[in-house]
A protein has these predicted regions:
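Non-heme Fe(II) oxygenase metal-center motifs and adjacent flexible, charged/small-residue loops
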Residues: 1-199
Length: 199
């Protein structure tokens, strides 16, 4: 089933560009592609007007079926806490066409929290030992040099609570959790963080 789901989700175009609010222009996405999925809603991308693509979940029969099964299981165990969630996809590549040549690329996302959401249910599709890291932070620094690490494979599911997702990660005076994923260039600690523990 997971292979069928992979084929279905990769058959639709994903957002590989975005509107950069700082530079005020459309730029290419380098580390990953994104896509939003909603039931009964579709939208073509219009990057100059800050609009990404939306795919109607009803048009993806296998995705709709698996989401329904997954949410039913989670809702039974959590008294309905998986209701009214939005499906968002992050697509990572090991190789990409750059200047008409297929090249190896580093992909991932650096240490951050998700201020825009309070809970996350993630289904890994097509991943092979894909690294996910979590760490507590206080006053812009990690609490230690040993983040919690998980290697995700296709079919794995993980759930992040409000604390795990790092919804308040910008409040540096509080203990908050951040996460990172992918290549070591994204998950490694900053030089000043390491120096904080070694000096």
């Amino acid at each position: 089933e997971i292979n069928q789901l992979y084929q279905e989700l990769t058959s639709v175009p994903w957002d590989n560009k975005y509107w950069d609010t700082r530079r005020q222009k459309v730029l290419n996405k380098r580390a990953r592609e994104n896509l939003l999925f909603l039931k009964g809603v579709s939208q073509e991308a219009d990057y100059p007007n800050k609009k990404g693509r939306i795919v109607d979940i009803n048009s993806l029969s296998k995705f709709d079926e698996i989401l329904t099964q997954l949410f039913d299981i989670i809702n039974q165990e959590t008294d309905g806490k998986a209701q009214y969630l939005i499906a968002e996809g992050n697509r990572y590549f090991k190789k990409k066409m750059i200047d008409s040549k297929l090249k190896n690329v580093k992909n991932g996302i650096g240490w951050h929290g998700d201020a825009e959401r309070r809970k996350v249910i993630c289904l890994c599709i097509g991943g092979v030992q894909y690294p996910m890291h979590w760490q507590w932070f206080y006053k812009h620094k990690p609490l230690n040099l040993n983040p919690y690490k998980v290697a995700l494979n296709s079919g794995d599911v993980y759930i992040m609570s409000e604390e795990a997702v790092g919804q308040r990660w910008k409040n540096s005076s509080e203990y908050t959790m951040r996460h990172s994923a992918g290549d070591v260039s994204f998950t490694k600690y900053k030089k000043e963080w390491i120096e904080h523990f070694t000096n």
